[in-house]
Amino acid sequence: MNKKSTAIFLMGPTASGKTDLAIQLHQELPVEVISVDSALIYKGMDIGTAKPNAQELALTPHRLIDIKDPSENYSAAEFRHDALQEMQKITQQGKIPLLVGGTMLYYKALLEGLSPLPSADEKVRLEIEQKAEKFGWATLHNELAKIDPISAQRINPNDSQRINRALEVFYLTGQSLTELTAQKGKEIPYHIIQFAIAPDRAVLHQRIEQRFHKMIEQGFQQEVEKLYQRSDLHPNLPSIRCVGYRQMWEYLQGNYDKDEMIFRGICATRQLAKRQLTWLRGWKSPIEWLDSLNPKSTKEKIIKTIKHNCK
């Protein structure tokens, strides 16, 4: 049996210092960086996403950054496909893939594979919507309860979008959403070493606030104004729903003043960090936690672990 190639996950909440650490590791280890961030994929969204700057990217190139226009969607399945391709290219060069970011759903998809859910079918969705107009979503929720009682219990009777998707999956496959999501895709064909970096809550909150104010100083408002002027962008797109961007967009719409926008942006970023930490604390695979307040010992710990595992 061939020995699996090694890959490294460097996970953590927003503003935890992942990018700086990745750049240091790139200077001392034979690693190439792959971004695992659902916001960094977008072109023209640099300041509000805390994207590495041109100098940092010249020093340490990041793959899967700036690969989509803000008008486009990008799924966890697409990420898995693209990341595995990049990982293969890196290992073929005799180097180690270093996956850095905080989009935990992407890590999960990469690690465990994805359930074999069908793609959306506009014709089927339209038929379900027409049925709902005639009989009401409560009736369709009752139908779902007969087909898939577990999903029906989870989904609010007023949540038309999720009822539609659950019924659509059944109509297309003959299997319930619960049955299909229980099926795992292919696991990642690599030996994964996983690290997580997370400062103390008070430190993280302070960093998030400082970083948001710094983004404002760097021209975050002007960045979002350019997006706001585009006729093809709107608040329901994943790009505009990114933390900070949504609040700035609503400020530009006149929904609240600048101080309120800053307050909401900081709060939303802190909530994102909390969700990311919740994911990490419930992570099934073994994680080595790093001391974010001692960068030197953190870097040395990673280097020692990698060298030991790559003998």
Swiss-Prot record:
Its EC number is 2.5.1.75. The keyword ATP-binding applies. It is an enzyme of class 2 (transferase). ATP binds at G12, P13, T14, A15, S16, G17, K18, T19. The record marks T103, R125 as: Interaction with substrate tRNA. One of its GO terms (biological process) is tRNA modification. It catalyses: adenosine(37) in tRNA + dimethylallyl diphosphate = N(6)-dimethylallyladenosine(37) in tRNA + diphosphate. Catalyzes the transfer of a dimethylallyl group onto the adenine at position 37 in tRNAs that read codons beginning with uridine, leading to the formation of N6-(dimethylallyl)adenosine (i(6)A). Monomer. HAMAP family: IPP_trans. This is tRNA dimethylallyltransferase. It comes from Histophilus somni (strain 129Pt). The lineage of its organism: Bacteria, Pseudomonadati, Pseudomonadota, Gammaproteobacteria, Pasteurellales.
